[in-house]
Amino acid sequence: MQILVTSASGANGDGYGSLLSFSLDGTPRGTFSTDPRITDPRGLSVSADRRLLYVNSGSDRILALDATGNVVRDTGEIPGLNAGGGNLAPNGRYLVGMRSARTIVAVDADLAGAPQNVLPAGIVPFPRGFASAEDGTLYLASGIGPEGEGENSIAVFDAEGTPLALRFITDDAVSPLDLAIAPNGNIIVSSEFPFRAPDAVTSIREYDRSTGSLVRVFAPPSGVGFHQPRGLRFGPDGHLYCVARDNVMAFDFADGRFLGSVVEMPRLNGQAVVFFPLRTD
């Protein structure tokens, strides 16, 4: 097993603009794939059989890679895609956040065919992370964009895209950057509040899946660098992981304890993190 991280580059990244691999102890293993179609990557998701890795590339395309890092599926260029996060839905389709269009689209797992809107364009001012529950309920983090546009909330939709709640949470100290669903069904959000402020408070926040009430807050001890938190992922060990500007942090989800920085790399500027089998696994 290995840890894979997308490192952002460009105007809003200043990272490495590639898909990086790390051993479970945090040792860098280099670039997972050197395919030139992977540029300034963002969202990541692993297929249910753990054989394919889906990657949202900054070249306006979606790719699927095998365990050797070879591209085995490619949508081709999708003009205007500007993909953010990506997640496989319970129905097997791959969901992608379109930042410019401010919506979520779906493509078939084989990456054939044109993307189909899951939600109307402009459904939120600036989409951040999202995730689907087992019943198809879709939770979409609505955050602040690079130009300061947006709002800080979570919108909820049923499996058909009908809005259930456009402001699911009431939290005056959150600015969502990614969203995940915990094993207990609650909603997890990485936050930097106020967004991009020099003195921003960074945290990971858990909300009750039924009421939207804040349950608890995860954060490392003071003095431990935790800047620009982004992608969230539950590992095979059940721990909660969050990739940030210079590291990947781990928390014991059962009791909330900070377990340490499992990856440390200056200018990582991580966007998404996943666990993916090695060829020898």
Task: Describe these PLM feature segments.
Residues 14-16, 35-49, 78-94, 100, ...:
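Beta-rich, blade/repeat-based domains predominating
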Residues 23-27, 65-70, 108-112, 157-162, ...:
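Short loop/turn segments that connect beta-strands within beta-propeller blades
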